[in-house]
Amino acid sequence: MVWALTPVDTVRGAQRCYIFAAGTYKVGRKDCDVIVQTDTSISRVHAEIVVEKMVAWDPQSGAPANPSYVRVVDRSKYGTFFNKVQGTQGSRLHKDEDAMLADGDTVTFGTGNATFRLSFVPIVVFFHGKKSGRISPCLQAVMTSIGAYATRKWSDECTHVLVDESCSLTPELLDAVLAKKQIVLGDWFKVMAEKNIHTEMPSSTQYIPKLTLDGMEIQVVEIKLIESCLAGYTFILGSSEKYKFGDKLHALLESTGAKYLHVDEFCANSQDSGAGENDKDILLVPAKSPLEFSKIRGLFPLSKITDVKLFAAILSGHLEATAIEPPAYIVASSNSTDETIVVDSDVEIDTATSDHTVAASKSEHHIEHISDDKKEVVAISEEDAVNLVEAKTSINLHSDQEKDEIVKPMEEDVKVIEKTATMRGFKVEGEDIPVMTKVPKDETLDSRDETCHVIYTQNLVVKSILQSARAESIETGGINFKRFRKRGAVSGNSFKDLIPYSREPYRESDYERGTVTDFMREEKKRRQMEAIAEDLFNNAKPKKKAAAGSSIHTMLTGRR
């Protein structure tokens, strides 16, 4: 078990402390195990809480073992009081005096309101393992050091469930989930024993195991995350005997915030209330018999989930969309009264990729392929097709499925006008049969990429049997990748990019206009003028020096 020292009132600087191991713990203002900052009557080291040994929970009495082996020793100037009632002083301890404490006793440090209550926090562990297996001696020693009590019998007094990794899901574990008891691994108790004293219980998030159910691995989460994880969902159930852990199913759904209805009740209300249109109405199907409700028409619009996946969603704390099977819908046939059930996930949506869309109906027109000249033949009516069969011509049907597509002829003939198509005919027993043949690619117009417009009616169904890409690969022996090259593309190192300011790089247009010649003429003239000015300036210097020298010489000679 664990001892908790909890403040009775909201005291500044006081926190709840959990004692996980035997030892001596100091209480004071600063640098102590239990810090109390209320008034000046609290000494630096005011008192000591001595835990001689950790006692376990007694299953017979349903209380902690007696005695508790917890003492308080006063080390202060103003004293320590225990079981102090409002209006009374209680029992005061003088310096170095101690007293034995029990579950529920209160201790007041100093003359203020720093009152704490000593309470017992039981740790009763339900060991869920193999019947022949036992707890390892190392783990047993750790659990004894913190006062944990281990049992193999599940009861409401159990606080935790100890399991091994990848343990199978059992009804006892589901009972623990319903009772909101955390499922942990043995390492969690080792972490608790290492702390001695702490302000909170160690988190078990990293020490939650993985369980297995019918080969499926389930990552269990904390109990608080399981609560209300299925809120908003309504599950349609059959008899409880059909499901795995059926006796726990209703309670589990209620604990997760989900609702449930019986199949008969849902079918009775579906016609009036329109039930089944909500996406969160899910039919629960037994995993061992997935076709249990396949014959009930009113359940067709519902999504489905197996009981195994539902238990996995509850223990993991969330329901994934991939675990839900989408509903089936009914497609009514136009030629009969039968109805086809199509699963929503198998529906293929066709998107039109051209400007003209041909209605794909079962008509009397049929396209056939002649292997000799590789041309497509269009039979216009059923009568002509019958005549072809009677005459035993060499026209071969491409498949048996296409034979069934020939139906009664329409009143008007189909007229196809296309630039790249020509009409021809041949006689079978004296009757003309119109045939539309495609012109080979060599006989088409200039532009290969030109769009061909076909004037057609909805009664014509054209099926292209030969693909152009396949024919090209047979003729050339491989794909011609040059046909994908862009035409008219200019390289990045073109002359226009290197010399962007010249519009006509190969014609001396600037010289023809005379702009460059005038500029060079003016530049030459300017340089000549500068040269003349430079010469005049240089010639003027010696003359000035000579004139200055002669005048001085004259003055000197004149004085003599």
Curated annotation (Swiss-Prot):
Keywords per UniProt:
Cell cycle, Chromosome, DNA damage, DNA repair, Nucleus
InterPro entries for the chain: BRCT_dom_sf, FHA_dom, Nibrin-rel, Nibrin_C, SMAD_FHA_dom_sf
Q: In which tissues or organs does this protein occur?
A: Mostly expressed in the shoot apex and young flower, but also in young leaves, root tips and stamen, tissues where frequent cell division or meiosis may occur.
Keyword check for DNA damage, yes or no: yes
Every FHA domain range:
25-87
Where found, per UniProt? Nucleus; Chromosome
Q: Which Gene Ontology terms of cellular component type are present?
A: chromosome; Mre11 complex
PROSITE patterns (alphabetical): FHA_DOMAIN (PS50006)
Domain named BRCT: which ranges? 115-190
Q: In Gene Ontology terms, what is a biological process of this protein?
A: mitotic recombination
Q: Which Pfam family is one of this chain's hits? A: FHA
GO function terms (MF aspect): damaged DNA binding
Please give the family membership noted in the entry: Belongs to the Nibrin family.
Q: Quote the record's domain comment.
A: The FHA and BRCT domains are likely to have a crucial role for both binding to histone H2AFX and for relocalization of MRE11/RAD50 complex to the vicinity of DNA damage.
This protein's assembly is summarised as:
Component of the MRN complex composed of two heterodimers RAD50 and MRE11 associated with a single NBS1.
Q: What does this protein do?
A: Component of the MRN complex, which plays a central role in double-strand break (DSB) repair, DNA recombination, maintenance of telomere integrity and meiosis. The MRN complex is involved in the repair of DNA double-strand breaks (DSBs) via homologous recombination (HR), an error-free mechanism which primarily occurs during S and G2 phases. The complex (1) mediates the end resection of damaged DNA, which generates proper single-stranded DNA, a key initial steps in HR, and is (2) required for the recruitment of other repair factors and efficient activation of ATM and ATR upon DNA damage.
Q: What is this protein called?
A: Nibrin homolog
Q: Which gene encodes it?
A: NBS1
